[in-house]
Amino acid sequence: MAEFPASLLILNGKSTDNLPLREAIMLLREEGMTIHVRVTWEKGDAVRFVEEARKLGVATVIAGGGDGTINEVSTALIQCEGDDIPALGILPLGTANDFATSVGIPEALDKALKLAIAGNTIAIDMAQVNKQTCFINMATGGFGTRITTETPEKLKAALGGVSYIIHGLMRMDTLQPDRCEIRGENFHWQGDALVIGIGNGRQAGGGQQLCPNALINDGLLQLRIFTGDEIIPTLVSTLKSDEDNPNIIEGASSWFDIQAPHEITFNLDGEPLSGQNFHIEILPAALRCRLPPDCPLLR
């Protein structure tokens, strides 16, 4: 087979016992591919491993894990300076794998690994919050954030993305909307939000299409606000057609400012960030990513 440049796989420590992954790596190595493997143990490991990847001269750094691992690796990559910055490869090994699923990464590990190593690179956007924290997929606030951050790890491990829905149903009687004001380019809204989705990608929370029109290379963030005084009637309403739905507010902008009279929490690719003021902006063509040719999130 054709020769491919070396890759470095940054593997979430929870996936070290994945036998099919070990077999896929060994098979590709036998075919002549050079694949370095590093395992994360604590926060900050990804930054160190990306620095090592640059010293090794690899062409691709592969994020092996869920949305949080992809976030950590991609954030480390965009912080690199100079030329010859490795591309991002994606190996979906998390609970929900929302970003990987939405961009069309194969579920089969051997196929996903081959794509991560040999796929074509495409420049994609990322988003940054308050000039510090980044996300590649989505920032969610309100009802959805509290569900994803509070769902027990054992439930997620046992049921995957369905666990978010089950835990949400258990908590409906205690969840209240967040009052806030949101501004963007040609956009202004103020009111009570049950769910806020600001997407570079389209889905979060285990497959929920919060921002169905989002693209990862258009220089824009997609905003969706689900409003209403009561959660259950609103959810029933949003199951209907989106057209002319009074409980859905939409917008698109390269930036959004959110202000709240009280502390609210946004979930950034699985990582919570709390505060009263958020400035979220797009970083156009921030990194190169190996994606399938029929990726639905490309313009």
Curated annotation (Swiss-Prot):
ATP binds at residues 40, 66-72, 95. It comes from the Bacteria. Its main location: cytoplasm. It comes from Escherichia coli O6:H1 (strain CFT073 / ATCC 700928 / UPEC). Its cofactor is Mg(2+); Ca(2+). Its EC number is 2.7.1.-. This is Probable lipid kinase YegS. The keyword Magnesium applies. One of its GO terms (molecular function) is lipid kinase activity. InterPro entries: ATP-NAD_kinase_N, Diacylglycerol/lipid_kinase, Diacylglycerol_kinase_cat_dom, Lip_kinase_YegS, Lipid_Phosphate_FormReg, NAD/diacylglycerol_kinase_sf, YegS/DAGK_C. Probably phosphorylates lipids; the in vivo substrate is unknown. The lineage of its organism: Bacteria, Pseudomonadati, Pseudomonadota, Gammaproteobacteria, Enterobacterales. Residues 2-133 form the DAGKc domain.
